[in-house]
């Protein structure tokens, strides 16, 4: 039984792509379904593409040449299914985009502690109150679940409140509350810088505009791409610009970063999709 229609019979056979997405996933200011429909509409000009939820991937992945893991939402909602999928990727040597060999968000938030210890320009992060001396002095701190996503469970607290919560070591991330000018995100395919977007209004962080970054800004973001071990795929470097003008890493999303691709101009989109397809052709 064919994975797709027989429309390619007698013609050049297209690569078959299983595009994993959750078209019903809701997030404030982000239209996951619209973005993935746009991308797959472009991909179908060169590939046979089928979209499905990660929960259904096992039924189709053996028939695909490449499995593209995109806007699937937080894997916390289907953790066992996700880990079973990763096991099959390893055992069957499935070709995937992204590759699942990164050490940032796809492995959890431990990397923020590692980058802090390695003195990278990152918001200082600990996961135990016993290490509070590592952090710069602050009147207010941010705490959030170490295995959380989408700001679920995030809270702003004082040091006194932290000490009164009996936080179990290793369960919560603790950071100083950083006063910043704006947030900015840098988007890469493999090691290629694609574009940058920023939120000029801190109270409306989901409203993004194209950001004209400097060579120094790109070099900042590239440090984290080079630190990471993703062989191929899309990565998003999220940072904040402090009031002193310094960039600090907020998050390195290397699993399924939302791209805000519809917020950039057509020329940037065209280059992004061409670079994405160039990588897919090499798999």
Please report, for each region that a protein language model flagged, where it lies by residue:
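Short, Lys/Arg-enriched N-terminal segments with co-localized hydrophobic residues
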Residues: 3-13
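Extreme N-terminal starter segment of soluble prokaryotic enzymes
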Residues: 14-18
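Conserved N-proximal alpha/beta basic substrate-recognition cap immediately N-terminal to
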Residues: 23-124, 128
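Short amphipathic alpha-helix with an adjacent loop that forms part of the alpha/beta core around
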Residues: 56-63, 132-137, 163-165
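A short beta-strand motif that forms the metal-chelation/ATP-contact edge
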Residues: 64-69, 144, 186-188, 195, ...
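Conserved anion/nucleotide-ligand pocket segment
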Residues: 138-158
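Phosphate-binding site of ATP-dependent enzymes
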Residues: 152-234, 238-248
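C-terminal active-site "lid" helix and adjoining low-complexity regulatory extension at the edge
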Residues: 241-283
């Amino acid at each position: 039984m064919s994975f797709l229609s027989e429309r390619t019979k007698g013609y050049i056979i297209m690569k078959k792509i299983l595009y994993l997405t959750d078209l019903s996933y809701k997030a404030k200011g982000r239209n996951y379904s619209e973005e993935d429909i746009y991308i797959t509409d472009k991909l179908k000009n060169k590939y046979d593409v089928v979209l499905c939820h990660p929960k259904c991937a096992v039924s189709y992945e053996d028939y695909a040449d490449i499995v593209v893991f995109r806007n699937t939402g937080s894997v916390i909602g289907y953790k066992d299914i996700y880990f079973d999928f990763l096991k099959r990727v390893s055992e069957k040597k499935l070709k995937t985009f992204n590759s699942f060999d990164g050490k940032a968000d796809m492995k959890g938030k431990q990397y923020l502690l590692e980058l802090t210890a390695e003195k990278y320009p990152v918001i200082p992060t600990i996961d135990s109150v016993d290490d509070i001396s590592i952090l710069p002095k602050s009147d207010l701190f941010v705490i959030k679940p170490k295995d959380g996503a989408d700001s679920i469970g995030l809270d702003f607290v004082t040091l006194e409140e932290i000490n009164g919560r009996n936080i179990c070591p290793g369960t919560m991330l603790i950071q100083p509350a950083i006063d910043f000018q704006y947030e900015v995100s840098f988007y890469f395919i493999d090691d290629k810088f694609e574009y940058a977007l920023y939120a000029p209004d801190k109270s409306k962080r989901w409203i993004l505009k194209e950001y004209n970054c400097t060579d120094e800004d790109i070099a900042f973001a590239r440090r984290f791409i080079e630190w990471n071990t993703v062989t191929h795929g899309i990565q998003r470097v999220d940072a904040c610009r402090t009031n002193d003008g310094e960039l600090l890493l907020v998050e390195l999303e290397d699993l399924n970063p939302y791209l805000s691709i519809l917020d950039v101009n057509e020329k940037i989109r065209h280059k992004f999709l061409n670079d994405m397809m160039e990588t897919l052709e090499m798999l």
